[in-house]
Amino acid sequence: EAQRRETWDELCDRNVAMHVKRYPQLREEIQRIYRDFVRPKKVLPSMRSLQFGGTPIELSESRIFNCAFMPLDHPAAFHEAMFLLLGGTGVGYSVQARHVNKLPGLTEPAPGTYRFLVGDSIEGWGDAVKILLKAYFNGKSLPRFDFSGIRPKGARLITSGGKAPGPKPLKECLERLQAVLERALARGTGTRLRPIEAHDMLCHIADAVLAGGIRRAAMIVLFDRADEEMLTCKSNLACTMQRTDCINHDAELYECDITTTSNGKDYHNVVLHSSQLAEWKEKGALPWYLFEPQRGRANNSANLLRGAVSQNEFYALMERVEASGAGEPGVYWTNNLDWGTNPCCEIGLKPNQFCNLTEINADDVKDQTDLEERAGAAAFIGTLQAGYTDFHYLRP
């Protein structure tokens, strides 16, 4: 309404008001901490707390946390990831076999169909993913998604700010999720998703979030170091050309049908520049992002158990990283293969745990006493944030 951005003091006022409403008995201490530490930027709350402080967090308290980690060991993990990412929370996830193998086997959807009106909310988008997956994990009928209730592209988002993406990103996401599920089901009823397939599904979900106007989806995936598909999912792909038709002589663009050598997967109508065709003729391979661009939505790291990897095995893995030409995968050293991390790898997280973040500005710390006072203020704010636990859309 004022046609300007929120000031720092206004943002702090909004944050204070939210905490005082939750903890009225701590009003004076909250106001003191913000006056002495947050307003002068000696200590900062979580970034999501600053961004969404007030009504957005009161409606969906998971939004106060910057990041989370979850193993993909339950069908609910997929729609929960959509919900969290749309709310601005980054997601780390595991597609290690020990987790993905706990997903139910796939089954043919039941005959018939029904109309499903997609809700115009982050819960509504999550529900659309949930309903689609129920058809393949639980044998329910496939829905006919009705997107008429979703605000058109460019409409103002009242609660969280920004502009609505319209229904197109979600529609494309659901189509791509279904394509992954159908390809997996072609192996036979009862087959389970491979780690690379579960990973691709999360990346397609992130693509919808990327277009959703909240913020770019932040993700990291952890996988078994022996998983060849995950290890090479950001490497150049050996392939054969089935068709190359010039579609623009001036721009030197060609429309191609391509088959990857590793798994025989067909890609149709891929547009390549003449220089890329020349690269293929020389190397017999093309960059991964021409085939599976959604994989760019996550950082990839092999999960390595401390004490269980020899020096030679580690060097061999690093040679694969160099050969990828993409600088990935990274490695994540751990003492527990069921634990994970947030996308920035700042903290180890248990399954389905949030990262409760505060920051201390160490740039202008004067002495030990000053540092300890800032640490106390940061701990106080972190304790306030830890009390926001009404995760109404997530599993208990």
Stretches with model-predicted labels:
Residues 1-396:
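Extended catalytic cores of very large enzyme megasubunits
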